[in-house]
């Protein structure tokens, strides 16, 4: 498991959550 993958996954999840909750 690479820290880079975790960072990218967290970034993607944040964008998705932002879009869904509309709390950017």
Curated annotation (Swiss-Prot):
Keyword Secreted listed? The answer is yes
Q: Would the keyword Secreted turn up in this protein's UniProt record? A: yes
- Cellular-component GO terms for this entry: extracellular region
Pfam families per record: Antimicrobial_1
According to its UniProt entry, the protein's GO biological process terms are: defense response to bacterium; defense response to fungus; killing of cells of another organism
Please state where this protein is localized.
Secreted
Q: For this UniProt entry, which segments traverse the membrane? A: none
Function of the protein: Antibacterial activity against Gram-positive bacterium S.aureus and Gram-negative bacterium E.coli. Has activity against C.albicans.
What is the protein's given name? Brevinin-1Pd
Give the species this sequence originates from: Lithobates pipiens (Northern leopard frog)
For this protein's source organism, the top of the classification is:
Eukaryota, Metazoa, Chordata, Craniata, Vertebrata
């Amino acid at each position: 498991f690479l820290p880079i993958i975790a960072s990218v996954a967290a970034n993607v999840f944040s964008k998705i959550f932002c879009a869904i909750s509309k709390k950017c």
